[in-house]
Curated annotation (Swiss-Prot):
<feature type="binding site">
    <location>
        <position position="433"/>
    </location>
    <ligand>
        <name>Mn(2+) 1</name>
    </ligand>
</feature>
<feature type="binding site">
    <location>
        <position position="285"/>
    </location>
    <ligand>
        <name>Mn(2+) 2</name>
    </ligand>
</feature>
<dbReference type="Pfam" id="PF00557">
    <property type="entry name" value="Peptidase_M24"/>
</dbReference>
<dbReference type="InterPro" id="IPR029149">
    <property type="entry name" value="Creatin/AminoP/Spt16_N"/>
</dbReference>
<dbReference type="GO" id="GO:0070006">
    <property type="term" value="F:metalloaminopeptidase activity"/>
</dbReference>
<feature type="binding site">
    <location>
        <position position="471"/>
    </location>
    <ligand>
        <name>Mn(2+) 2</name>
    </ligand>
</feature>
<keyword id="KW-0378">Hydrolase</keyword>
<keyword id="KW-0464">Manganese</keyword>
<feature type="binding site">
    <location>
        <position position="296"/>
    </location>
    <ligand>
        <name>Mn(2+) 1</name>
    </ligand>
</feature>
<dbReference type="InterPro" id="IPR007865">
    <property type="entry name" value="Aminopep_P_N"/>
</dbReference>
<keyword id="KW-0645">Protease</keyword>
<keyword id="KW-0479">Metal-binding</keyword>
<keyword id="KW-0482">Metalloprotease</keyword>
<dbReference type="InterPro" id="IPR036005">
    <property type="entry name" value="Creatinase/aminopeptidase-like"/>
</dbReference>
<dbReference type="GO" id="GO:0030145">
    <property type="term" value="F:manganese ion binding"/>
</dbReference>
<feature type="binding site">
    <location>
        <position position="471"/>
    </location>
    <ligand>
        <name>Mn(2+) 1</name>
    </ligand>
</feature>
<comment type="function">
    <text>Catalyzes the removal of a penultimate prolyl residue from the N-termini of peptides.</text>
</comment>
Length: 506
């Protein structure tokens, strides 16, 4: 039985649809209800974020200067590029509009947004740009001014502060258009401060990630309900996009991966154009975006409500076990790297049972790196404003900041060098996404010390499985975790396929 989390006190954009999914009983259909609520919403906490960043800068004076994304045209074209706001700018503004900039005066605790000056021609063609009164009403900003005053305002700030004042930039290339005299340009401190701040999500951010996951769950369910009448990978992509957009999520957090059969062994497969006939599994890695916040959800499923082969079922159940054994250990203070190692050890045990690995102990096979042939990526990553979100250091890093596949699963190297590897903290949102892939290219290029433990003849019977990945978005708490992803998996997933409409085209 599957139940989706009912939205509770979510922070919703004004007049956006609310996604609800009903609890599934054995003979029920999965019903998606679309409800529009027109309510006053808490503003995105830009000022709170600015203060957090300032605290990480560890200075009581200075001016943070952030540039938003500009409107640009495609090369040799009069068509505008699809707009995507700079995520660092959004974090301190909440503004998803083009051609804006902002400053934050640390000493005065003043956040100022600069919006485009009025342009009659653009307004006639494209509609009005963000205005001062609208911006003050919508965003958590102290003052809104026009772009034409930005350079002069920065110069005036520098003059008032006196010689030696600091202007904090993300990048050297984002300096003000006009030179600002008598200021020190610091393009190193701000990024580290913002990365540290962004790694821990507040309640508003968690609400947005939760909402993105609710939309994604609805889209994944619609794919499951319709998969029996789909004939091509593009049908899966189209279904996911259709549901997402209809529920108010006009953007995807990343390019949809709808990989069937052996295509699923390509981690970031993107063509999505091959027929489904004769394929055992589809690996659908797809997540909607909500108000610039990402979801990242992967489900692997057959084209019918039955496991297509004993091998397919064995691998799915093994990946399911890998994920569950890692998730139950998530809480503040746990080293994520240890969870990754646990996933590899679970894979090795499973492969020894199935006979895919042979001729060695668990430790010998782990030390050889043989499991990397079938699980070549990390267990997961931060998620937030980016699908692979920022942090002061990678959760997969060792104490020297390095990440190496060969070193990663070798206890001889791990034991002495990872005592200070980063630990999970309450408020982080990370993915748990183990996978098993049968890639002929990986096997053909394997090192002798790896492949000697692999029964290559037996592996041939598993090649049609392609790849299996299961991925959820996990909120770390002080005592455990909350799974923000409500898309069904396992037996519940098969039940939805069984109840789905349409006859099987496979």
């Amino acid at each position: 039985m599957i139940s989706a989390i009912e939205p509770k006190n979510l922070l919703r954009p004004h007049s956006q649809p609310v996604v609800t999914t009903s609890t599934l009983q054995p003979d029920d259909e999965c019903n998606i209800e679309l409800r529009i609520e027109d309510t006053t919403v808490d503003k995105y906490p830009a000022k709170q974020h600015a203060r957090r960043v300032a605290a990480e800068i560890h200075r009581d004076r200075g001016l943070v200067y952030l540039m938003g994304q500009k409107s640009t045209l495609y090369e040799d074209s009069d068509q505008e590029r699809t707009f995507r706001q700079r995520r660092y700018f959004f974090y301190m503004s909440g503004v998803d509009e083009p051609d804006c900039d902002l400053t934050y005066d640390i000493n005065a605790d003043k956040l100022t947004l600069y919006v485009p000056d009025f342009d009659l021609k653009r307004t006639i063609w494209m509609g009005p740009t963000l205005g001062r009164e609208e911006a003050l009403q919508r965003f958590d900003i102290d003052e809104v001014k026009y772009q034409s005053s930005l350079d002069e305002d920065v110069k005036q700030w520098a003059q008032n502060q006196g010689r030696g004042s600091t202007l904090y930039l993300l990048h050297e290339s984002q300096k003000p258009a006009e030179k600002v005299p008598n200021v020190f340009i610091d393009s190193k401190t701000l990024k580290q401060a913002m990365d540290t701040s962004r790694a821990i999500k507040d309640e508003h951010e968690i609400g947005l990630i939760r909402r993105a996951n609710e939309v994604s769950a609805a889209a994944h369910i619609d794919v499951l309900r319709g998969i029996r009448k789909m004939s091509n990978e593009r049908d899966i992509e189209a279904s996911f996009l259709n549901t997402s957009v209809s529920l108010g999520a006009h953007k995807q957090a990343y390019h949809i991966i709808a990989a069937s059969g052996s295509n699923a062994a390509t981690l970031h497969y993107s063509k999505n154009n091959e027929p489904l006939k004769g394929r055992q599994f589809v690996c659908l890695d797809a997540g909607a975006e909500w108000n610039c916040y990402a979801s990242d959800v992967t489900r692997t499923f057959p084209m019918t409500s039955q496991w297509p082969s004993a091998e397919a079922k064995h691998i799915y159940k093994l990946v399911e076990h890998m994920q569950e054994s890692c998730m139950v250990r998530v809480k503040e203070g746990v080293r994520y790297l240890d969870l990754h190692i646990l996933a590899h050890r679970s894979l090795i045990r499973g492969f020894l049972t199935l006979g895919i690995f042979k001729g060695g102990t668990l430790e010998e096979i782990q030390n050889s790196g043989a499991s990397n042939l079938f699980f070549p990526h990390g267990l997961g990553h931060h998620i937030g404003l980016e699908v692979h979100d920022v942090s002061p250091e990678s959760i997969m890093a060792q104490d020297n900041g390095d990440y190496s596949d060969n070193v990663l699963i070798s206890p001889n190297n791990l034991s002495p060098c990872t005592t200070s590897s980063p630990t999970l903290k309450s408020g982080m949102v990370v993915t748990i996404e183990p996978g098993i892939y049968f890639s002929q290219i990986a096997l053909d290029n394997a090192k002798p010390e790896q492949v000697k433990y692999v029964d290559l003849e037996l592996v041939k019977t598993y090649m049609p499985v392609g790849g299996v990945r299961i991925e959820d978005d996990i909120l770390v708490t002080k005592t455990g975790y909350e799974n923000l992803t409500t898309a069904p998996k396992g037996d519940g997933m098969l039940e939805i396929i069984r109840q789905g409409d349409g006859s099987c085209n496979i």
